[in-house]
Swiss-Prot record:
It is found in: Cytoplasm. GO terms for molecular function: structural constituent of ribosome. This is Small ribosomal subunit protein uS2. The keyword Ribonucleoprotein applies. PROSITE patterns: RIBOSOMAL_S2_1 (PS00962), RIBOSOMAL_S2_2 (PS00963). Disulfide bonds: none annotated. It comes from Aedes aegypti (Yellowfever mosquito).
Length: 288
């Protein structure tokens, strides 16, 4: 599928992510239409998915999505809780229309109901749990892209992306890879490293999120641990002293410029005269 182009080839970094998210781990049973995507079978009976075929089908699906003129006509659906967060994130970055949760029956076939929609392309997390939208899409000739495990039925599925669609991390990673390739084909991002992390597409347990929120609320605030002390503002007017600062600063310079003038400040003659006058006055006061 990459056409021997290095820019479209499967990178080692992506393979590492897939292995860490157990994308290659299938189930113990195999659908006869999924046998071509199985690499081997482990001794414990679990089938291993060929990641090379996974990447080829992922690029094919990304090309189909990027070819849609209006991104809002692409519908991403996941009734499984593990894929709802990934679907919402995928729709946010690719401008698709998400359906996270229960699918309203007749949304593609019943024109009377308010929830009626006419998408041009449908993407589902699991064709087994999302069988209702897949079946309705077959009635109105809507092509379907599905993330399929080794035991997933491929009835009414046009493009099957083989992967582990039962692991929360695998589901989030596959939606992240699909969103990245779509944005690359549209020219919105380069083929360098994408700034968005796959962690944003992973499922988060609501109970754990509530516990984290409760822990943040229960933790004392910083202002409670360190109460603020009243700030005393000194309103003394220092304008007079500031005006005298230049004269004080200039005094040492004047002293250094004229060191010979210092001895003149002390006049020994004046002292002698004072002492003489004082002695004379004492003598006159004695009456001798």
């Amino acid at each position: 599928m990459s056409g021997n182009l290095d820019i479209l080839a499967l990178k080692d970094d992506d393979v590492t992510k897939m292995l860490a998210a157990t994308t290659h781990v299938g189930s113990t049973s195999v659908n006869f239409q999924m046998e071509s995507y199985v690499y081997k079978r482990r001794p414990d009976g679990v089938h291993i998915i060929n990641l090379g075929r996974t990447w080829e089908k992922l690029l094919l699906a990304a090309r189909c999505i990027a070819s849609i003129e209006y991104p809002g006509e692409v519908f991403a659906i996941s009734s499984r809780p593990y894929g709802q967060r990934a679907v919402l994130k995928f729709a946010h970055y690719t401008e698709a229309t998400p359906t996270a949760g229960r699918f309203t029956p007749g949304a593609f076939t019943n024109q009377i109901q308010p929830a009626f929609r006419e998408p041009r392309l449908l993407i589902v997390t699991d064709p087994l749990t999302d069988h209702q939208p897949v079946t309705e899409a077959s009635y109105v000739n809507i092509p379907v892209i599905a993330f399929c495990n080794t035991d997933s039925p491929l009835k009414f599925v046009d493009i099957a992306i083989p992967c582990n669609n039962k692991s929360p991390h695998s589901i989030g990673l596959m939606w992240w890879l699909l969103a990245r390739e779509v944005l690359r084909l549209r020219g919105k991002i380069t083929h360098d490293k994408w700034d968005i992390k796959p962690d944003l597409f992973f499922y988060r347990d609501p109970e754990e999120a509530e516990k984290e929120q409760a822990a943040l609320e229960a933790a004392p605030a910083a202002k409670d641990l360190y109460p603020e002390e009243p700030i005393v503002v000194d309103e003394t007017n220092w304008a007079g002293e500031d005006a005298a600062l230049p004269a004080v600063a200039a005094a040492p310079a004047a002293v250094a410029a004229a060191p010979a003038a210092l001895p003149q400040l002390v006049q020994a003659d004046d002292w002698n005269e004072d002492e003489t006058q004082t002695a004379g006055s004492w003598g006159g006061g004695g009456g001798f």
